[in-house]
Curated annotation (Swiss-Prot):
Residues 148-166 have a biased composition (Basic residues). Coiled coil: none annotated. Glycans are attached at residues 39, 106. One of its GO terms (cellular component) is extracellular space. This is Interferon gamma. The keyword Glycoprotein applies. Residues 147-166 are annotated as: Disordered. It comes from Equus caballus. Type II interferon produced by immune cells such as T-cells and NK cells that plays crucial roles in antimicrobial, antiviral, and antitumor responses by activating effector immune cells and enhancing antigen presentation. Primarily signals through the JAK-STAT pathway after interaction with its receptor IFNGR1 to affect gene regulation. Upon IFNG binding, IFNGR1 intracellular domain opens out to allow association of downstream signaling components JAK2, JAK1 and STAT1, leading to STAT1 activation, nuclear translocation and transcription of IFNG-regulated genes.
Length: 166
């Protein structure tokens, strides 16, 4: 690597690092704004123990943890939806929703849209209940491990073991 390439690579790393730091700083600032607005630093908030943290600790596998995280993210989206008309904290909520979008949905708009469709489905609607029950078998089959997947088989060479004996 020549000197010019090294300088360009260094500048790129510095820019990316500082922008990441700036984004994280803005994210934490907006969380602090929400904490202040909701008076979430008050000692009585801890009464009854944590809301999500103990549950998250119980799940170690990444795939299992994703299930719990999806429920928690769903909660936050519902919370932000209920507060969407509050102009005092709108910027903070938008910043945090954007960070959730990047971290949880890998910046995939289609994943976010599907997720939002799911959390908007009304559970008390009879038509929705009927459709859900109608689709239950397919959903359960989709959840089950795929037992009939073709597994790669080793070739059965009849001369394979004989060479080792000679």
């Amino acid at each position: 690597m020549n000197y010019t390439s090294f300088i360009l690579a260094f500048q790129l790393c510095a820019i990316l690092g500082s922008s990441t730091y700036y984004c994280q700083a803005a994210f934490f600032k907006e969380i602090e704004n929400l904490k202040e607005y909701f008076n979430a630093s008050n000692p009585d908030v801890g009464d009854g123990g944590p809301l999500f943290l103990d549950i998250l600790k119980n799940w170690k596998e990444d795939s299992d943890k994703k299930i719990i995280q999806s429920q928690i993210v769903s909660f936050y989206f519902k919370l932000f939806e209920n507060l969407k008309d509050n102009q005092v904290i709108q910027k903070s909520m938008d910043t945090i929703k954007e960070d959730l979008f990047v971290k949880f949905f890998n910046s995939s708009t289609s994943k976010l849209e599907d997720f939002q469709k799911l959390i908007q489905i009304p559970v008390n609607d009879l038509k929705v209940q009927r459709k859900a029950i109608s689709e239950l078998i397919k959903v359960m089959n989709d959840l089950s491990p795929k037992a009939n997947l073709r597994k790669r088989k080793r070739s059965q060479n009849p001369f394979r073991g004989r060479r080792a004996l000679q």
